[in-house]
Regions:
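Non-catalytic all-alpha helical scaffold/repeat segments
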Residues: 1-530
Length: 530
């Protein structure tokens, strides 16, 4: 019995398993092992390494074993094909590939055909998987085998043998320049609504297919993915982190177009656009010019699905990264008054953060400063909605005025003057005592709340499972300093500092909440005049 196999077997479900597993995979090709013993361990090994990043090492180990000890590899292959375990059968491609690298007389094409013509679906899958280990020149040099693969793939697609489609996509992707009709077959498969199939298409776009050399087929496959369901998280993750990353700088219009088509395919998806927030934020940080253009064009779109999507993306984005929202100057410069009015209305209807509302509308003012109608409408929006709800906007305008042209400064001064006068008059109004709450009623109200607070406090104190029982580090304060004791050791003393935060809530919500919501609802449902 081989020591390397015994050591691995004895460490199953123990802490030292992973050290033994790594050593086993590194040294397997040098060891004289009993294949039957090895095969009997494989189900246990696969169970142990399931969903672990090191799971690939067993495939590399079997590949090297078959290359350096081809007789063992052939014995292993002949016994693997009789196994029923799906996980264990996945070692077949690595085994065949390793044997083919050795100098023994071994016809891998015959063995591949044996697997591909097998009545057992699991063995046929491994036959397709083995094809991926071949090289383009091997298929070019063996036209008979290449023709055999072409006919087999065509038959499986026509017969809708869907269990093989994910493997077929990998084969077609690798040999797209070799196999006849590979493009057409990939396009056909990309139209199938199957998470497994669409994942393989996305994986192909991520790793195998080069956009610059396969531009037409790449775009067709990409836009066929517009059908993907928002619940296909693994596909969306590949799009966000691999596919779209290729286009953020040089071809952002592809991302823009894909997201539009994805939204229009099912307009109920507007709220699910947040699944692509990573791409949205990457565009904002790495290609701000196109980001501005994209946001501006979506706000100017007639279909409200784009307004809802932009609102969702912006509202859910990290607030520290989206303190301002400027729109695209070139795009805005080509618009007429009605189009500018439409965009401003949608900003007010769909965007809620004061920083984003005022900065986006102010960026429009700077571009359309020579259009009297646009200026008057924007002034009205500032006066009646933005400054009315957020008086601090006056301070914002004062700062922006310093960086603006004289024409813009003139308009800003008009807005500031009107609103300062308004707030001065508001502050001069006398309080009417009849509208003040009763002191007696307030006393009773506060007493009830105080009693409830005391009850809750007592319940928390008496609860043995209180959150405070989880606290292991006790903070100690001395003078102006603070230190703590952690695992029996006192930390260095640090000086305490004051933490303060403030927020400006919209005035209109306190004065007339229903009226404010009515304004936003009207603006959200506003349609462009024809």
């Amino acid at each position: 019995m081989s020591a390397i196999l015994s050591n691995l077997e004895n460490s199953m479900h123990k802490n030292k398993f992973w050290n033994n597993y790594r050593s086993f995979c590194n040294d397997l090709h040098q060891e004289e092992i009993d294949i039957d013993h090895f095969i009997s361990l494989l189900p246990k090994i696969f169970k142990q390494i399931e969903k672990n990043a090191l799971s690939y090492q067993i495939y590399d180990a079997v590949n090297k074993l078959s290359e350096f000890q081809p007789n063992k590899g052939i014995e292993l292959f002949n016994k693997l094909i009789k196994i029923e375990s799906k996980e264990v059968l996945t070692l077949i491609p690595s085994t065949l590939d390793g044997i083919s690298k050795s100098n023994v007389g071994f016809n891998k094409f015959i063995e591949a055909e044996f697997l591909l013509e097998n009545n057992l679906d699991e063995l046929k899958k491994q036959g397709y998987a083995f094809l991926i280990t071949l090289k383009e020149e091997e298929l070019n040099q063996n036209q008979d085998f290449s023709g055999y693969i072409y006919n087999l793939i065509k038959t499986d697609i026509e017969n809708r043998n869907t269990i093989f489609f994910s493997y077929i996509i990998r084969v077609l992707g690798k040999f797209i320049m070799v196999l006849p009709e590979a493009d057409e077959n990939l396009i056909s498969l990309s139209k199938i609504d199957s998470q497994e199939v669409l994942y393989e298409i996305t994986r192909l776009l991520s790793y195998e297919l080069d956009y610059s050399n396969n531009l037409e087929i790449y775009e067709i496959l990409l836009f066929n993915l517009k059908t993907i369901d928002p619940k296909y998280h693994n596909i969306i993750s590949l799009l966000n982190h691999l596919v779209f990353q290729k286009f953020i700088i040089d071809s952002p219009e592809l991302i823009d177009r894909f997201l539009k088509e994805w939204l229009l395919f099912d307009k109920k998806r507007a709220g699910e656009i947040i699944k692509f927030s990573n791409t949205f934020e990457e565009l904002h940080s790495k290609n701000s010019n196109y980001f501005k253009k994209m946001v501006t064009s979506w706000l100017n779109a007639d279909d409200p699905v784009f307004h809802k999507a932009i609102s969702k993306l912006i509202m859910e984005a990290p607030h520290n990264e989206f303190k301002n929202l400027e729109l695209d100057e070139n795009y805005l410069g080509q618009l007429n008054y009605k189009e500018i009015q439409f965009i401003v209305i949608k900003i007010v209807g769909y965007i809620y953060f004061k920083e984003l509302i005022r900065s986006s509308i102010f960026s429009i003012l700077k571009v359309k400063i020579d259009d009297v109608d646009c200026v008057n409408f924007i002034k009205a929006i500032f006066n009646e909605y933005i400054v009315f709800n957020y008086p601090s906007t006056i301070e914002y305008l004062e700062e922006e005025k310093k960086k603006s042209s004289r024409k813009v400064q003139k308009v800003v001064n008009e807005i500031i003057e009107i609103n300062k006068e308004y707030f001065e008059k508001i502050n001069q109004l006398e309080f009417i005592n009849e509208f003040n709450p009763s002191d007696k009623r307030l006393k009773i109200y506060n007493g009830i709340h105080q009693k409830e607070f005391q009850i809750k406090l007592k319940e928390t104190t008496d609860n043995k499972h209180s959150f405070l029982n989880m606290c292991k580090n006790i903070q100690l304060r001395t003078g102006k300093g603070m230190f703590s004791k952690h695992e029996g050791i006192y930390t260095e003393k640090t000086e305490m500092s004051r933490i303060q935060s403030s927020a400006e809530l919209p005035r209109g919500e306190f004065i007339d909440a229903i009226g404010q919501e009515k304004i936003r609802a009207i603006y959200r449902n506003y349609t462009r005049e024809i």
